[in-house]
Amino acid sequence: MSQIKLIVGLANPGAKYEGTRHNAGEWLVNELARMYNTSLKDEAKYFGKTAKINTVNGDVWLLIPTTFMNLSGKAVGALAHFFRIKAEEILIAHDELDLPPGVAKLKQGGGHGGHNGLKDIISALGNNNNFYRIRLGIGHPGHKDQVAGYVLSKPAPQDQQKINAVIDEASRCLEILFKDGVTSATNRLNSFKA
């Protein structure tokens, strides 16, 4: 596998969206930054907040786009093109309706599953979907007509606890990924349930 050089946490910007389910990817990147004693700074030329962490495998960029979710590719594309980071060296953390809270899955490739952030990133990378993703379960409201309101609202306290637990586990699994590779990290994360 290629070494991961960029980890992106998808979110919508602004106080209005803080703490909403759609921002789960951002929570993971913030936790990773905290583990490495750094904080993300606004970087206008990458349309997001960035930081660089030093792992056992070398430097890894952290990015939280400050565009709206459906324009996430603008930020990912800008940073990836500038540093010549290939799609398979990118990991995207995002909310996942098809997994329950407290569950996360690490995988490479695949479609966008209706996720507008992923859709825009695939497009910005020249229709290349070969990046890794950590799908953070947020559960499903039950009917597709309720999805927009659901992802833009805050989780119930018991769901938030489960999401926090899986984010904690996912951040540990990223350390395993840096040290032992994607297979070890995938096996551990994909069998976890809060």
Swiss-Prot record:
The record marks 12 as: Discriminates between blocked and unblocked aminoacyl-tRNA. TRNA binds at residues 17, 68, 70, 116. InterPro entries: Pept_tRNA_hydro, Pept_tRNA_hydro_CS, Pept_tRNA_hydro_sf. The active site is at residue 22. The keyword Cytoplasm applies. Keywords: Cytoplasm, Hydrolase, RNA-binding, tRNA-binding. It holds the Pfam family Pept_tRNA_hydro. GO terms for biological process: protein quality control for misfolded or incompletely synthesized proteins; rescue of stalled ribosome. It comes from the Bacteria. One of its GO terms (cellular component) is cytoplasm. Its EC number is 3.1.1.29. It is found in: Cytoplasm. One of its GO terms (molecular function) is tRNA binding. The keyword Hydrolase applies. Its main location: cytoplasm. The record marks 95 as: Stabilizes the basic form of H active site to accept a proton. Belongs to the PTH family. Monomer. Hydrolyzes ribosome-free peptidyl-tRNAs (with 1 or more amino acids incorporated), which drop off the ribosome during protein synthesis, or as a result of ribosome stalling. This is Peptidyl-tRNA hydrolase. It comes from Haemophilus ducreyi (strain 35000HP / ATCC 700724).
